[in-house]
Amino acid sequence: MYKQVIVVRTDIKMSKGKIASQTAHAAVDASHKADKKTLDAWKKEGQKKVILKVNSETDLIVLVEKCQKMKIKYSLISDAGRTEVEPGTITALGIGPDTEEKINKVTGSLPLLK
């Protein structure tokens, strides 16, 4: 089974719409980095996505380092700063798609964004 995880920072003030746009950026950009075999398998299974949260930029960077060690494709999203946050603010991280087993080793302890 395959999935994609998007992780959002909750320590910065973002409206629901802003969070939606940042998760969309993360999902699309990360999926473009996937190899064809993984992308095709993920699409065939219905493109499962899970949205999780962290409390800081540091927490996102720790996840990036774990992705690098496990060779999982990812996309770290920095906002342009035109609306709600300062330019260059890191808002979200798209992880995968990849196997659930691999991604769970990186994000398995994180809470859902509600």
Regions found by a protein language model. Give the residues of each.
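Compact, glycine-rich, soluble single-domain proteins
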Residues: 24, 32-33, 37-58, 69
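Alpha/propeptide regions of enzymes that mature by internal proteolysis
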Residues: 59-64, 72
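Generic structural signal for well-ordered, non-membrane alpha-helical segments
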Residues: 16, 20-24, 60, 99, ...
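Short basic, glycine-rich beta-strand/loop surfaces that mediate nucleic-acid
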Residues: 6-7, 45-55, 68-114
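Glycine- and Gly-Pro-enriched alpha-helical subdomains that act as flexible
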Residues: 4-5, 9-34
